[in-house]
Amino acid sequence: MRLVFMGTPEFARACLEKLHSDGFDIAAVYTKIDTPKNRGMKLIPSPVKEYAQSVGLSVYQPQSFRDEETVQQLRELKPDLLVVVAYGKILPQAVLDIPKYGAINMHGSILPQLRGSAPVQRSILNHCDEAGVTAMYLSAGMDEGDIIEIRKTAIQPLETSEELMARLAQLAAPLCADTVRSIEAGTAPRIPQDNARATYAPMLSKEESPIDWNQPARFIVDHVRGLVPWPVATAELGGTEFKIYRVEYADQKTEKAPGSVVALTKKGLLVACQEGNTVLVRELQAKGGKRMPAPDYFRGHPITIE
């Protein structure tokens, strides 16, 4: 079976690497254009492009599929199946109609829950106990295609979105290869989604970053976990604005108002939240500084405990 792979981040790279190592015929790889990063604004290739070039696969980086020339270029590759994993571009019906067996996608949620662009992050932000990867057929609707298989995993109590994404990539890679095999063998099921049960996972924004200390401890912990690595939770502590990377539950009670600094311990900064509870800020970053353990920062920048 002749494949064309479409993907961009590390999550997609894991799937491409598995397909290539398992010996599938990959005619070409499509990925988003190189993006400028850091102060020098140097163009950085996607993880998928880096891997594809390292093993000699042809790489295409179209701006979109709106023009006929780009669609015709794909048509000339004569793919039997498109494998799409976190590509980051909308594929029109004219593209989905090209392969004999259509297009499949590895989506980072237990569909029909959390359709959309940020399913892994929203699974933590929504306080879910379980996450997963769904192998599905692509359709014109957003993540509405028929399901082929779902593989699930428990979300760990203090796991960040970044850490969960890495674990889900290890679920997605073998699922991707197994799905291609089942389609090739003619044994892949088509299970329609129950649209009545659908929930959505919209793109994250920086406006979501500020921590609301009036929330319960679990909401604050999940808020911080869900926003790593981007856009990262923010808070003002002792008059300084910080990015907050890791927060844990604390047993200590307090009469201080939510958002007040309660104490600095060897493990981190205790901050008051709802109903007299506290959370422990373990890792943070001041503006212009480095990400570091909270005790290390406050050793050099003493904080006043009122």
Residue map of PLM features:
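N-terminal Rossmann-like dinucleotide-binding module
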Residues: 1-42
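Short beta->alpha connector loops
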Residues: 8-11, 63-66, 87-89, 227, ...
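Donor/substrate-binding cores of folate-linked one-carbon enzymes
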Residues: 21-22, 32, 81-200, 205-207
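Conserved beta-strand segments of alpha/beta enzyme cores
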Residues: 25, 56-58, 102
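A short, local hydrophobic-aromatic micro-motif
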Residues: 27, 104, 145-148, 245, ...
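N-terminal glycine-/serine-/threonine-rich beta1-alpha1-beta2 phosphate-ribose binding loop
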Residues: 36-78
